[in-house]
Design a protein with these regions (language model features):
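A short, active-site helix/loop in glycosyltransferases that binds the activated sugar's phosphate group
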Residues: 40-41, 76-77, 81-112
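Nucleotide-activated donor-binding/catalytic signature segment of Leloir-type glycosyltransferases, i.e.
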Residues: 181-198
Length: 231
């Protein structure tokens, strides 16, 4: 990165330069999500501002903990290790809020300041204006490894042999899209399994009879909540 007053050789230096130019004061708040490659620069150059960290996913490995040790989610490990320099954390649910506080006290001897701010809500239940499409199924999520959409695709391919009317529409974008497309093409399932990308889903859930999910990691499960709210 080349500027009139600086030559920066990596992302960390760029973040540090950016923060310095902001001239942050005690009236400012810096919100961190995942802190990969930027966490240290933010804490070193935040000035008098406050720093908050959003925890939007499972924050630890349930099968890698004991009374003395816990394995944090790698995306939050740096922030948690520097918790005394973080002014507050934000969780999506009260359950996770209480869990974070309890685990910090147990494993780090420190009680952080944690606020609960839900990432979404349903204002009203939604009902289909017309009949739902028979045997139509939907999934909606990031197309990421932990969502395991590939499991759903393979399951639908098998189920199609017994229920020929099945269709499966996949909404979302992500790094797994190419691999999912390959599975669909390999099994010649293009006629009944579709990748439909990002779409506003408010009125679309009502078209389907079944919502599918194989996710093994959910911070809040917003699309699950939306699907339940649509029957």
């Amino acid at each position: 990165y080349v500027f009139e007053d600086a030559v920066l050789y990596n992302k960390t230096e760029f973040i540090a330069y950016f923060l310095q130019r902001l001239n942050l004061t005690r009236d400012d708040i810096v919100i961190l999500d995942r802190a990969s490659d930027i966490g240290q620069a933010v804490l070193q150059h935040k000035g008098d501002s406050k720093v908050g960290v959003v925890i939007h996913a499972d924050h630890y490995s349930n099968n890698m903990m004991s009374e003395q040790h816990i394995l944090w989610n790698n995306y939050y490990e740096y922030q948690f290790s520097k918790a005394k320099y973080i002014d507050f954390f934000i969780t999506a649910t009260d359950i996770q809020n209480h869990m974070v506080c309890r685990q910090f006290e147990q494993y780090q001897g420190y009680r952080p300041r944690v606020y609960t701010i839900p990432v979404g809500s349903i204002d009203a239940l939604s009902y289909p204006k017309l009949s739902r499409k028979p045997y139509a199924m939907i999934s909606a999520s990031r197309l990421a490894n932990e969502k395991h959409i590939d499991w759903l695709v393979k399951a639908v391919i098998v189920a199609k042999r017994q229920v020929p009317e099945l269709t499966f529409d996949i909404y979302g974008e992500g790094s797994e899209k190419t691999r999912l497309r390959k599975i669909i093409d390999t099994h010649r399932a293009q006629d009944y399994i579709r990748l439909l990308g990002h779409v506003k889903l408010d009125e679309i859930y009502n078209d389907y009879e079944l919502f599918l999910s194989a996710s093994t990691s959910e911070g809040f499960g917003l699309t699950l909540m939306e699907a339940v709210g649509s029957g």
